């Protein structure tokens, strides 16, 4: 696998803060970092106030416990993901037959029958390709999700990097158009 790495997000707020969440999000820039000046326009006539600008990237980590050791163990396993602003929940398992996984037994059977995101499938099934179990939750105060995609990356026989994007779940009763594309849901 040429792309064997995990991705996390971290803030891109220009305040020198290591992290931010709702209760301590000071703004994107140092000049909107206190409540007294948060309402002021900071760039020309644009209404770019601190409260209206999203927080930076966020790291999602599937740790067994909320301890330093378990969080770092999840980083090493690459059982992590990144999101920007919205607090989207994502968990993915891969295996050769995950058809018995349901919402209620998702984690138990995911770990038992497959490997979590960031893991390696130990052997190749000659009878079928891998299957995936994916659980996604939108931010409770955010917009509805448009779709879930899996991006398959590989190196071809000529040594060139390739990718294919698969739409695996989407909102509403949309269908693919004649070119095989799915129109965005829009907001």
Regions found by a protein language model. Give the residues of each.
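C-terminal functional module detector
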Residues: 1-187
């Amino acid at each position: 696998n040429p792309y064997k790495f995990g991705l996390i997000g971290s803030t891109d707020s220009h305040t020198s803060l290591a992290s931010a969440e709702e209760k301590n999000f000071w703004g994107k820039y140092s000049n909107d970092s206190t409540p007294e000046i948060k309402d002021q326009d900071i760039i020309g006539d644009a209404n770019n106030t601190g409260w209206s600008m999203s927080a930076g990237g966020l790291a999602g980590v599937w740790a067994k416990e909320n301890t330093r050791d378990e969080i770092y163990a999840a980083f090493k396993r690459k059982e992590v993901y990144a999101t920007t602003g919205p607090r989207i929940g994502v968990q993915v398992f891969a295996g050769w037959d995950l058809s018995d996984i349901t919402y209620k037994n998702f984690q138990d059977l995911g770990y038992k029958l497959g490997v979590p995101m960031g893991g390696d499938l130990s052997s190749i099934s000659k009878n079928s390709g891998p299957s995936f179990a994916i659980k996604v939750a939108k931010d409770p105060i955010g917009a509805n999700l448009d779709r879930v995609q899996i991006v398959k990356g590989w190196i071809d026989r000529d040594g060139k990097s390739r990718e294919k994007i698969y739409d695996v779940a989407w909102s509403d009763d949309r269908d693919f158009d004649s070119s095989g594309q799915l129109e965005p849901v829009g907001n």
